[in-house]
């Protein structure tokens, strides 16, 4: 790991957050899925943000490290680590690590730094991260150009339920689903990420950046 005291988060870098389970093991399909996606993110010279822990967080940081083969690739892997008594292993290949005692503070940093949010399969913590992002997107506390990419078929039932229950009962609006994308492979995920990156790279002075908007 590089000296985290000397590294600073570059506000001009495009960053992709990946949320997912700490319980997923190497060799599982989802681990490889996240590893491959993170590698592509690095190859496209985008920063990665993860929880900096085991499981899919580890898959993300390892994949991102593997993708930085170009000499002038200046992308970074950022770990926002929550201190838990049962989850002490820190992910490898983090360039910058921030430690948190409270989930709320950690989530706020994720929101401030992320240009795209990718949600891999996970449990209560991952679902919290998904709905926290979704809620802030709905009320425009973060930029309304942030895509939420859901990886794998696990999320299909949840989105079906959101349509059949809250949407049908008019508890949410159709537009609340506009930024939700279900994908099962890396290419469509990267297509969405690259579209967002293209908008970011235009450098329009009016482009919404969470690092400026979310406090």
Model-based region annotation:
Residues 55-119:
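Acidic/glycine-enriched connector segments
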Residues 26, 86-88, 156-159:
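Short, charged/polar "capping" segments at the starts of alpha-helices
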Residues 92-93, 100-182, 189:
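Conserved phosphate- and dinucleotide-binding cores of soluble alpha/beta proteins
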Residues 1-20, 179, 184-215:
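SAM-dependent methyltransferases
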Residues 1-79:
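Glycine-rich beta-alpha loop segments
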Residues 34-35, 65-66, 133-137, 164-167, ...:
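Short, solvent-exposed amphipathic alpha-helical segments in soluble enzyme
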Residues 20-22, 51-52, 80-83, 100, ...:
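Fold-independent oxyanion-binding glycine-rich loops
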